[in-house]
């Protein structure tokens, strides 16, 4: 049953997204984060350390717009700030997803430049503003950094120019959308494209 309570609805969305991402192998072990913006501007986000394929309501916590836990004792993921910056940059964004797939991890390690270029694929049209396969979408690659505040500062200036999201080298992707369904569709599209690109590079070797 779909809940009319904003918090309960957000929790349901996050749990369902975690199960879907786990089915595809995008959130191994306790990797990944899932969040949804609440009507009051706060954020529902997965608790640090939980397996996203086995989430319960207790695995979702509430944080402020700048990433501080609302309830004493709750421990947000260290990467919560990266979600917060996406919401801050884009008022229309309602959900943010972070996954650790094999394709995104390997391709970002192979890529020597600052972006993975995706060209000629029909599925590029899953991204906002893309009307044709005959185009190139740039997926920015940022070097990994355990200092999340510093990494957030590097990523933030580019957030308005990322139709496909971005990838952290050797780490994983960040994708978002106006709703959880849109964010999941974009993540699925991006992961398909990255898997195709990885296969192409294997064949070309």
Curated annotation (Swiss-Prot):
Top-level EC class: lyase
Function in brief: Catalyzes the dehydration of methylthioribulose-1-phosphate (MTRu-1-P) into 2,3-diketo-5-methylthiopentyl-1-phosphate (DK-MTP-1-P).
Pathway field: Amino-acid biosynthesis; L-methionine biosynthesis via salvage pathway; L-methionine from S-methyl-5-thio-alpha-D-ribose 1-phosphate: step 2/6
Listed GO CC annotations: cytosol
EC number(s) on file: 4.2.1.109
Protein's name in the database: Methylthioribulose-1-phosphate dehydratase
Reactions it catalyzes: 5-(methylsulfanyl)-D-ribulose 1-phosphate = 5-methylsulfanyl-2,3-dioxopentyl phosphate + H2O
Family: Belongs to the aldolase class II family. MtnB subfamily.
Single GO MF annotation: aldehyde-lyase activity
Keywords of this entry: Amino-acid biosynthesis, Lyase, Metal-binding, Methionine biosynthesis, Zinc
Pfam family of the protein (one): Aldolase_II
Domain of life the protein comes from: Bacteria
GO biological process: L-methionine salvage from methylthioadenosine; pentose catabolic process
Keyword Amino-acid biosynthesis: yes
Gene designation per UniProt: mtnB
Protein residues bound to Zn(2+): 98, 100
Cofactors (names): Zn(2+)
Cofactor mode of binding and number, as noted: Binds 1 zinc ion per subunit.
């Amino acid at each position: 049953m779909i809940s009319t309570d904003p918090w309960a609805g957000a929790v349901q969305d996050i749990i369902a997204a975690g199960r879907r991402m786990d089915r595809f192998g995008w959130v191994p072990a306790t990797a990944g984060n899932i969040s949804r913006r609440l009507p009051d501007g706060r954020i529902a986000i997965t608790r640090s350390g939980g397996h996203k394929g086995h989430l319960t309501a207790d695995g979702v916590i509430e944080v402020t717009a700048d990433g501080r836990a609302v309830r004493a004792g709750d421990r947000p993921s260290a990467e919560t700030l990266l979600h917060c910056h996406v919401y801050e940059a884009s008022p229309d964004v309602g959900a943010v997803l972070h996954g650790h797939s094999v394709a995104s991890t390997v391709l970002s390690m192979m890529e020597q430049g600052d972006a993975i270029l995706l060209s000629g694929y029909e599925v590029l049209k899953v991204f906002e503003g893309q009307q044709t396969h005959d185009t190139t979408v740039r997926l920015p690659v940022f070097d990994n950094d355990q200092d999340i505040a510093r990494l957030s500062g590097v990523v933030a200036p580019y957030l308005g120019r990322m139709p496909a999201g971005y990838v952290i080298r050797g780490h994983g992707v960040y994708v978002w959308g106006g709703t959880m369904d849109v964010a999941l569709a974009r993540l699925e599209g991006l992961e398909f494209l990255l898997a195709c690109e990885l296969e192409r590079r294997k064949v070309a070797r």
